Amino acid sequence: RYALAILAIVYMFNFIDRQILAILLPAIREEFGVSDAWLGFLTGTAFAMFYIILGIPVARYADRHNRRNLIALAVAVWSGMTALSGMAANFVQLALARIGVGVGEAGCSPPAHSMIADLYPPEKRSTAMGVYTIGISAGIMLAYLLGGWVAQNVGWREALLVVGLP
């Protein structure tokens, strides 16, 4: 149960860092003067392209190596890249940092699913996966609540730093 709770919390942070950008887009548009198309690239393509490309190789790596360590590395990468997003001096730097978030987050789900499959017998696995995926909704909720509040009261950069540094 402890491992499952940790995995769900990790998944929650995964989605906080993934989704927070959505609520910050108006401030980013204002600062960098970019179009909706570029904001779409930032929130979609920049992240998803590398997440998709790396998903299978990361899963294969997880099959042969220590999954716990892979998840820890993934958390460090995506959290660091989220924090770097808040330090971007221009739109290109922000896009590169978001690509880094996608690279890091690609290392979460494959090893987590594999660990859950090993920890729970088939008759309990669906419940375990349900607990794990609570992290999705909790992360989205917290991204909007925390991100919106911090952005409104301090700034969009600080919102990314707050969620990226824990």
Tell where the protein language model's regions lie, with residue ranges.
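Small-residue-rich transmembrane alpha-helices and their cytosolic helix-loop interfaces
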Residues: Y11, G44, A48, V75, ...
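Residue-level signature of mid-helix packing/kink "hotspots" within the transmembrane helices
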Residues: Q19, A48-I56, A106, I140-M141
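Extracellular/periplasmic helix-loop-helix junction of adjacent transmembrane segments
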Residues: L24-I53
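Cytoplasmic helix-loop-helix junction between adjacent transmembrane helices
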Residues: A97-S137
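Symmetry-related core transmembrane helices of the 12-TM Major Facilitator Superfamily/SLC fold
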Residues: E158-P166
